[in-house]
Structures are given as C-alpha cells and as structure tokens.
C-alpha cells in the first residue's frame, strides 16, 4: 500500500505528471468544472471532504511557487483565506484574480487536474502553480 499522504489514484497521477509552471486546482462543490479527463470529483456530501483538508494533503506532495485565488475571497470568505495563508509558506506568491478568470483557467492547457471537494463556503477555489524540487 502507498505510504505517502495521497491515496486517491487520480490525484496521485495528476501530481506525478506535473512539471514546472503546471497547475492543479482544488475547488468548492459549486465550481463549474469541465467534465473531462482532468476532473477529479471527491465530493461526497456538503463539506465532505473540506477544501482546506484536501489542500493541506496536496501541499504535502506538491512543490508550489505561486497560488491563484479569486479576488472575491477577501470580502466573501476571509476565514478561508486566513486558513490558506496559514498552510502556505510566506515565500509563496499569492495572486488574486477575478472569479470569472478562475473559472476560465479550469480548461487551461497547463492545468493537469481539477479537484472538486464537498466545500460549500464561497470562493473556496485555488490554483497551485508548480515549482521544481531542485
């Protein structure tokens, strides 16, 4: 059995295929994720699994250099924003973009996976930009 944190085969595969500057997104239950090979649906019921738990686990296995968040999270979900900031290194650049741009980036060619959680708080979506480990 796999020893590292992520047991889901689709998330493991997405992370294994990521190169420098590639993206992986983690999203709330309401994000309109395209129904293609990049969709990884973990949602079981409302708030299961939670966005922040999935993010924490992914960060154990993925080296990131930058994150993208919806500008709207500042006003509509400051608690989630604070939790995200607690999880990431202060060296990681945070870029705020309009939520509509977050949605359009789900189909970006550099995006290797779109994880859907059961999260039901607004604007709980993040794009992780990969870094190298050397």
UniProtKB/Swiss-Prot annotation:
Its EC number is 5.4.99.62. It is found in: Cytoplasm. Belongs to the RbsD / FucU family. RbsD subfamily. The lineage of its organism: Bacteria, Bacillati, Bacillota, Bacilli, Bacillales. This is D-ribose pyranase. One of its GO terms (molecular function) is intramolecular lyase activity. Keywords: Carbohydrate metabolism, Cytoplasm, Isomerase. The active site is at residue 20. It comes from Staphylococcus aureus (strain USA300 / TCH1516). InterPro entries: D-ribose_pyranase (IPR023064), RbsD-like_sf (IPR023750), RbsD_FucU (IPR007721). It catalyses: beta-D-ribopyranose = beta-D-ribofuranose. It holds the Pfam family RbsD_FucU.
């Amino acid at each position: 059995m796999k020893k590292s944190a992520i047991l889901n085969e689709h998330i493991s595969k997405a992370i294994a295929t990521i190169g420098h500057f590639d993206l992986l997104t983690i999203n709330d239950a309401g994000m309109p994720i395209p129904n293609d090979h990049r969709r990884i649906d973990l949602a079981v019921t409302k708030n299961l699994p939670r966005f922040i738990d999935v993010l924490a686990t992914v960060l154990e296995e993925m080296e990131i250099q930058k994150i993208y968040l919806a500008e709207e999270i500042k006003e509509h979900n400051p608690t989630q924003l604070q939790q995200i900031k607690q999880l990431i290194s202060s060296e990681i650049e945070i870029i705020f973009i309009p939520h509509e741009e977050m949605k359009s980036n789900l189909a970006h060619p550099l995006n290797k996976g779109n994880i859907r959680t059961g999260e039901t708080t607004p604007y709980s979506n993040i794009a992780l930009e990969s870094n190298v480990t050397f």
